[in-house]
């Protein structure tokens, strides 16, 4: 990454909270000889066709089990259409240390921490606080009680999130494996069941969220305006679908929307399965993602992952609008890479804190972070971090582009924005979609930013902005430049950086490409790298703006 302010951050310390979880008490004596509990947790039928699910082993009526009706849509749900379906849940949360709860040890070596027994209520670290809620969607052929998933849930809960995870038990619908879908013949012959399994996963997440927000046990502790998702492998795709992306529903790559859940505010994913480049999961060329709500998305992908290849993930991420970050882990294959745990959870927690709890320091860190120290080799592939909506006396600075001139222009002036949007009096300018925030002239925040335009017939046909009084003074004595006024306020970048809670705006120069000078101002590392590849020069951080 070319931005001078890019930073390597240390791994986040352990979360500040102890963790407790809801009951998953089970009677393993109910299993047949030779069976393992994983067969029930994953919903794998017996050889004679007898269904198996975790509900067959559960002994505590207080364990959440959500039952819902599948829509009567055979195209999406196949044999499940119009029938009832159920999912059990486990919920982990920030817990009181001295609640007297003990771990519940499972046969696979996992200990469920401070588990509720009988009708015990959850024992929160702060019973008066409302916590952000995090959906946790595990991958295919797994369960929340797998060691890596339980570890991940505890990390996230220890950082102040109520985390709930459905037991998807995908084998109840199909025995197709992700690896099988790399075989086109196998994909075609099993595609109907596979589509149904993907679609019902999304329904399960939506209905589980309904339950959490309505349950008298949990709803009084949840901030319903701060709901996010974490998905691993196929769980990542499930969250994309919940946010409105269309699912590939035929071998011809047609796609169909499962649902749109507007409650989901951001999505973090690890090795998200989004199909193969030749068989994308979200429609042709991943175009189904165009129908997804424009919420922030983080994707962490392995460069050696052939099951969920980085190329397919990048193809989808490049279609997103809004805050989106793609991080690659060098040499990592599919599955949880414990050597990269610090990288995975530092990126994830910083992202969730920035986009869900709206912590300005986390948002500024997210913009600057290029990798996490130690651990695996993590690298940013794509990064666009948008500011929060304006608050108080903040205002948006909107960027425009004129294709015939090859020039960029930015303004916070409402009249200028309206004129350029109308395209009548001044033609040829369109919004790029890029914005950053500033303060208006006269604000108690920031310093005045001067704007100059090249003097007609003498100077360049472009605008120049500076918060540096020395630069403004130099231009005022240069006949090539005409002063247009002070147009916004921002803090000045000192030593190439900004305060912890501010966004960094970098100035780029086109190096005279096309014969006429032009500058561009951006907080996007992706744009910076793109412009550098086109011959632009990074002049460095110039403004510090509100997050």
Q: Where on the chain are the PLM-derived regions?
A:
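Short conserved active-site loop signatures built around small residues
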Residues: 5-129, 162
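Alpha/beta-hydrolase-fold serine-hydrolase catalytic core, especially in secreted/extracellular enzymes
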Residues: 8, 331, 338-391
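Short substrate-entry loop that stabilizes the transition state in hydrolases
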Residues: 99-101, 123-176, 306-307
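The feature captures the conserved acid-bearing segment of alpha/beta-hydrolase catalytic domains
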Residues: 125, 253-328
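Acidic beta-to-alpha connecting loop that harbors the catalytic carboxylate
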Residues: 140, 234, 303-306, 331-333
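Alpha/beta-hydrolase active-site loop
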Residues: 184-219, 224
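Primarily recognizes the serine-hydrolase "nucleophile elbow" in alpha/beta-hydrolase
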Residues: 208-282
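Extracellular glycan-binding segments that recognize GlcNAc-based cell-wall polysaccharides
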Residues: 392-547
């Amino acid at each position: 990454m070319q931005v001078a302010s890019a930073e390597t951050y240390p791994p986040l310390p352990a979360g500040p909270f102890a963790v407790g979880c809801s009951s998953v008490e089970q009677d393993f004596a109910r299993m047949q000889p030779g069976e393992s509990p994983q067969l029930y947790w994953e919903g794998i039928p017996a050889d004679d066709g007898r269904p198996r699910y975790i509900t067959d082993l559960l002994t505590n009526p207080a364990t959440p089990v959500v039952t819902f009706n599948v829509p009567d849509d055979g195209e999406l749900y196949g044999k499940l259409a119009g029938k009832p379906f159920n999912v059990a849940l486990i919920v982990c949360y920030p817990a009181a240390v001295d609640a007297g709860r003990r771990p519940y040890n499972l046969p696979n070596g996992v200990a469920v921490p401070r588990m509720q027994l009988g009708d015990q209520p959850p024992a929160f670290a702060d019973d008066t606080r409302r916590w952000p809620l995090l959906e946790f969607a595990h991958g295919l052929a797994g369960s929340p009680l797998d060691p890596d998933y339980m570890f991940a849930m505890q990390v996230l809960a220890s950082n102040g999130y109520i985390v709930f995870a459905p037991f998807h038990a995908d084998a109840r619908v199909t025995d197709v494996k992700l690896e099988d879908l790399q075989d086109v013949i196998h994909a075609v012959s099993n595609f109907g069941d596979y589509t149904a399994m993907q679609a019902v996963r999304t329904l399960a997440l939506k209905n589980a969220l309904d339950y959490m927000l309505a349950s008298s046990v949990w709803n009084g502790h949840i901030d319903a305006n701060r709901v996010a998702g974490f998905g691993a492998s196929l769980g990542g795709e499930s969250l994309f679908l919940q946010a409105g992306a269309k699912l590939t529903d035929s071998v011809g790559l047609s796609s169909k929307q499962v649902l749109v859940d507007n409650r989901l505010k951001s999505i973090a994913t690890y090795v998200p399965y989004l199909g193969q480049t030749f068989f994308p999961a979200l429609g042709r060329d991943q175009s189904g993602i165009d129908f997804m709500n424009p919420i922030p998305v983080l994707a962490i992908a392995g460069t050696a992952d052939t099951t969920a290849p980085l190329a397919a993930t990048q193809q989808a991420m490049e279609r997103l609008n809004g805050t989106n970050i793609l991080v690659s882990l060098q040499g990592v294959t599919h599955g949880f890479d414990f050597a990269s745990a610090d990288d995975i959870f530092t990126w994830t927690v910083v992202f969730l804190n920035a986009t869900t709890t709206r912590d300005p320091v986390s948002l500024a860190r997210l913009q600057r972070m290029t990798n996490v120290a130690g651990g695996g080799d993590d690298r940013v592939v794509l990064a666009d971090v948008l500011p929060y909506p304006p608050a108080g006396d903040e205002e948006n600075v909107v960027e425009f582009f004129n294709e015939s001139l090859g020039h960029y222009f930015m303004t916070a002036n409402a009249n200028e924005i309206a004129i350029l949007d109308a395209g009548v009096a001044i033609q040829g300018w369109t919004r790029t979609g890029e914005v950053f925030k500033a303060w208006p002239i006269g604000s108690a925040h920031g310093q005045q930013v001067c704007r100059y335009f090249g003097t007609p017939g003498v100077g360049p046909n472009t605008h120049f902005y500076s918060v540096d009084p020395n630069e403004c003074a130099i231009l005022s004595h240069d006949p090539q430049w005409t002063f247009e006024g002070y147009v916004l306020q921002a803090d000045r970048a000192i030593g190439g950086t900004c305060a912890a809670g501010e966004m960094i705006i970098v100035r780029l120069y086109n190096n005279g490409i096309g014969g006429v000078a032009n500058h561009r101002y951006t907080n996007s590392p992706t744009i910076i790298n793109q412009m550098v590849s086109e011959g632009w020069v990074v002049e460095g951080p110039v403004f510090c703006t509100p997050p």
